[in-house]
Amino acid sequence: MSQTNNAGISNTNQNNNRKGGNNKNYQNRNNQQQGGQQHQGGQQQGGQQQHQHRNKHQNQQGQQQGQQQNKQGRGKTPLNVESFPINLSQQQVQQLQAFQQQSQQNQSAQFQSNFLPPATALYTPVINYFINLYNNFKSQSHQDILVSYDSFFKSCETYYPHCALPTIENLIPILGDKFEESSFTDRFFVLLYKEIYYRYYYALVFQPNINTCVESWQNYYQIFHTLLSANSPNDVEIDLPNAWLWDLVDEFVYQYHTFAKFKLKKQDVDFLSENPEIWDTTNVIRYLYYIIKKSQIFSANTNRFESSSEDFCSHPVYKMLGYYSVISLVRVQCLLGDYTLALKTLELIDMGKKAMYTYVTACHITLYYYLGFAYLMSRKYNEATKALNTILVSVASKSKSQNFQSDHNEKKTDKMYALLTICQALYPNKIDENVSNNLKEKFGDKLLRLQKGDLTVYEELYTFAAPRCIGPVPPYISGFNVTALDPHRLQLSLFLEEVKQQSLLTTIRSYITLYSTISIQKLAGLLQIDPEDLRVKLTCYKHKLFNVLGKGETKWNNQLDIDFYIDQDMIHIDNRLYAKETDSFINSILKFEGSLTPSYNWM
Amino acid sequence: MENDQEQPQQEMEQEQVDIELSSLQGQERIEYINTLIADSYNIAIAKKLEEFLDIQINENIYLFQANSTLLKLYQFNPTHLNKDSIAKMLAKALMNFPCNDFLFLSYMIPSIIQKEEPLLKLFILNNFLETCKFKEAWSHINSHSFFSEIPSFIDNIRNFISGVLSITYQNISITMLGELLNLSDRTQLVEYIQSKQPTWKISDSTVSLQSDNSKQKKADTFTFDQLSRILPTFIK
């Protein structure tokens, strides 16, 4: 990896030298292109660029490497595109040199995992996409912004596969006179671009260095404060597509999560003890709360004599930002292990079919992932199954759009299948046929082993599927040592404890399904355990089932399950599989009725 | 900006924290606690919540949300962590079995503290109750005075066990019932069974735990809901 990287950089340098471009040069070119056809121009460039991209792989790279990188979606920078060098600041030059030295000296990924070299050149397509993004942002049209937002990201992935994006200072000159420092919209655009810059940085490195984290935090601070300090929604002359708003909030929590998982160095700890507010849990939660409050999505229409346009919830940016903050808050609460609060927060959200969370697929998936997980940890396996089943049905029906998020969504989907597998093992329940087939394809062999009570498989699947829980305060403050406090391991061990308590229950279930009555003695003999132990296990079975169903529910509406009671020494089994005559009669009546009705109407 | 919003809020909170818990009663007190925990990240309310936890123990009332908020405050402010309070709230959670309160709390307690006293005995008891090893549970309770010192603790655990037995057994021998409920004295046991009437009935050496109504199989009965779905068909 590091070698390609190096080569990429030196190549681009050569390229730049050959062109001998300077700042003025690219400004000229831009002005030529700005005549109303940028969008088209951008697309053309995009096509061209893809073509070159492919050529490049065949010509200059080893076939194998090319294939591998193509798969990752991050090829090497195409070179046959006009580009202009960036005048790096003193600090950036140092960073770049340090980076080059490091990657030459040691091949270990250690250094690269927390640092990205600065971008050294601006490429024409990127410039065009950037201008497009800016113009559309000013036009405040959802659709156009979304298109240019997506294509800007795509062009960045092509041209800056192994380095940071150009900084906003590099890009502002491109906009020339159009950019006004004094305009609210333009200043906000700068903040948003910076957010994209850091998001890109976080996407490429495993653990960004602390300076980057601090800068990104400060940028979020600015964004939130700009929005929170507005006196009237009319002052905020911006509009953003839902996908962008979701990415913004989602990334905020993602970066918080990344930061909380850090293994801090001594100097980082020193720095943080002086700046405790940076990525602090309470602050993160507080910002989410403030946005929700400001957005008024849950408090509007109460004491209103003022015109409704004065409500912040009438402003789409505030409304959706507030809404997404609720979902992100649920995520934070789950990460901290507070599942009751998470489920309580979720009650705020209308879970109807046309609910707002369906606007953005990533949001839809995230919400249901944490909902399913919270239910699983609350031992409400049937609720977890329901939630996971719903979202997986909906994911399967959606056409697979290829954007830079689809990778991420796919990973989440796999995780949800794993969670569903666990639920199915602990509490078998009816799920959609399609989902069931997919599940068997992905985790069929695992499910069998889970049903046999194989703890290692439970651990494996849980570790794969569960979010990595974190503590609200870093160890250097709490004073606990890291291993003692590892919240993730705590969740895992409590989960496995529950699985252990459930052991044998699945076996018992499979045996008693075969009988309508059986004596305790006989069943104990079959299971080769002590009759007294069996009594305890049977009582436990009932207790756990009650746990799953919850207090309110007394009905046994699970078709796959069986009910039993003990009469002194005999077990009486009420097998639901065969005891559904009433329902099946009623359903057949309705079915036949349904197939008859259309002919009436036709007459 | 932040100051604008926070200042009046903090003043209000200060006023709230200053109210004496002992001056409030019943519903009024619950409402007060509810307003306190609405601002769940303010460590200043921890003292009040600890106080309220003692009240919950002494007066045999229960508010899970208050206790979980207190635990959360410990989680966010580890220097304030008070193991005895955690032990108390866990005991209250056990008294509320079969709800999963104990589980929810344990997700937020560092595992190292879980393995030490004063919490260890609670986690052991939790495990016995979760796996329905009631005999072991009773001997564990009897060997720790901590449990019997909490008003109504033993009664609540016994009620939980009765509940599980009721959904499991239709009839059970009276000696076995006595063992599982830790009522070895016959008169005490009979008294307890009588308190559960009319659901529980003694007949000779066995006790019937399920009322006659629930014995009837649901399979051969209609509910009106089911019937109403097909009624339109018949009307045509």
Model feature map: region roles:
Chain B
Residues 1-62, 76-236:
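Charged, E/D/K/R/S-rich low-complexity terminal regions of large eukaryotic assembly subunits
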